């Protein structure tokens, strides 16, 4: 996909995936508008990382939207009374780190922003293969949201739709890490951990998936 001189709103959380999408867009010479959310999550480490990534890639604009999903909780990421799981991802079971409706809300806000600034794309770091099985990170969800987006705004109705761009959707975490380094993402400045300690916990699902993939990528890199 040719992104040169195209405007793109990237949902930039500060994690590895969204930072990689930002890096790919930057290398493609797109005009990047970053959007993060202070949504009542357990910590603000990822927002700090998002700000660092936005500055690193010198994007056009970076906004942090206040939207408090902790008002009703429903997830261990927005409710401190729920424990973050450390026993691993269970097959065919959605973990309690899933935040009800989060991606639907965030992409809807991004769609409004994109339409207001006449952006061509919304960049998402969702990937379906080795993440936690969230329902709003899957190909069928992205396909249906695109259909909704095409009906829900002026550009879509005028046959000039804003497209959801998901370059990582079918990649595993090792492949994403390779892309991150290939696109000059400051890997050590991204934040994936569910906890807000000074250093990543190394125990939560997100840490373990990231660390295992990094070790695999590094081993393969050193063999070459």
From Swiss-Prot:
Disulfide bonds: none annotated. It catalyses: 7-carboxy-7-deazaguanine + NH4(+) + ATP = 7-cyano-7-deazaguanine + ADP + phosphate + H2O + H(+). This is 7-cyano-7-deazaguanine synthase. ATP binds at residues 12-22. It comes from Prochlorococcus marinus (strain MIT 9301). Keywords: ATP-binding, Ligase, Metal-binding, Nucleotide-binding, Queuosine biosynthesis, Zinc. Pathway: Purine metabolism; 7-cyano-7-deazaguanine biosynthesis. Its EC number is 6.3.4.20. Binds 1 zinc ion per subunit. Its cofactor is Zn(2+).
